[in-house]
């Protein structure tokens, strides 16, 4: 429903903007609307048909644009037609967003539109076009450095490498609804949440853990069989425990269960470990993705 709701909102915005406008504000609205519509179709399409290459003429999803009147007889478009619209929307967005300076990372600017077109070209196996767009998208962004990843991170859009994000505030997720927040489900440090409160931690198994080299910084994103991770060094759970003692800490009334072996400690927590104001931002695009596409 999320993607279709956004498509509807994008179409409403596009219908409200006069053809041929040269107003910079309206151009930024039009560019962002087309980019988000492309983002939505790019996310929905793979659920309803196999990959682009070799399946171009197979049915995918119905397309609804601002130019179409409401019509219940709107059959599934081909994969080719869906991706044609995605590329066309993103190309239009790149043109409309020329020179646009966004207020924060929750908005789409020209580089994000390039990044989305890089994704689309990647899905279509247009390798060189994907690499070219990724290079334009990532200009000026710096990936995480190794030292930054030796502690729980991925909390704020201000962190290295975040290009586009949902910027969450305490008004969106706080102690009253942290149970259903993303750090409360995916992370391990939100007290009283679905994961920490009842011990439903996201983890890997020993086979995968052992495949990760000891020199790979990502190995610290999980505790080992002894509930140790170097990434817990210097960390504190509301002054109740620190370091590896965080793993065995329990807090009454479904506040925190002890970690199990291979529990993830990758994601930090807004306000510090053990808080339940779950206002962690949600990344939608990072520069590391563009580096991977480029390579």
Task: Name every feature range the model reports, one short phrase each.
Residues 52-66, 179:
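Short, flexible, mixed-charge acidic loops at enzyme active sites
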Residues 1-48, 77-80, 94-100, 274-282:
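Conserved, well-structured interaction surfaces
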Residues 131-282, 287:
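Hydrophobic-face positions in mid-chain alpha helices that act as interaction patches
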């Amino acid at each position: 429903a999320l993607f279709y709701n956004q498509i509807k909102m994008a179409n409403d915005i596009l219908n409200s903007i006069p053809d041929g406008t040269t107003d910079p504000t309206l151009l930024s609205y039009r560019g962002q609307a087309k980019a988000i519509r492309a983002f939505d179709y790019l996310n929905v399409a793979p659920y309803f048909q196999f990959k682009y290459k070799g399946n171009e003429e197979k049915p995918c999803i119905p397309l609804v644009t601002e130019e179409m009147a409401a019509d219940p007889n709107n059959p599934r478009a081909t994969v080719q037609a869906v991706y044609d619209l995605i590329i066309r929307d993103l190309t239009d967005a790149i043109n409309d967003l020329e020179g646009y300076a966004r207020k924060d990372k929750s908005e789409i600017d020209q580089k994000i539109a390039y990044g989305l077109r890089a994704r689309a070209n990647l899905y279509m196996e247009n390798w060189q076009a994907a690499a070219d767009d990724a290079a334009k998208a990532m200009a000026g962004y710096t990936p995480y450095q190794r030292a930054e990843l030796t502690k729980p991170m991925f909390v704020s859009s201000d962190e290295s490498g975040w290009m586009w994000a949902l910027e969450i505030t305490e008004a969106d997720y706080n102690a009253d609804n942290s149970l259903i927040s993303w750090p409360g489900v995916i992370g391990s440090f939100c007290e009283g949440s679905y994961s920490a409160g009842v011990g439903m931690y996201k983890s890997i198994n020993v086979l995968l853990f052992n495949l990760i080299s000891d020199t790979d910084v990502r190995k610290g994103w999980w505790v080992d069989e002894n509930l140790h991770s170097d990434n817990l060094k210097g960390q504190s759970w509301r002054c109740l425990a620190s370091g590896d003692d965080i793993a065995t800490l329990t807090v009454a009334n479904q506040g925190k269960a002890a970690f199990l072996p291979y529990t993830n400690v990758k994601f930090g927590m807004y306000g510090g470990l053990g808080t339940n104001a779950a206002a962690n931002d949600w990344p939608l695009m990072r520069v590391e993705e563009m580096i991977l596409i480029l390579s």
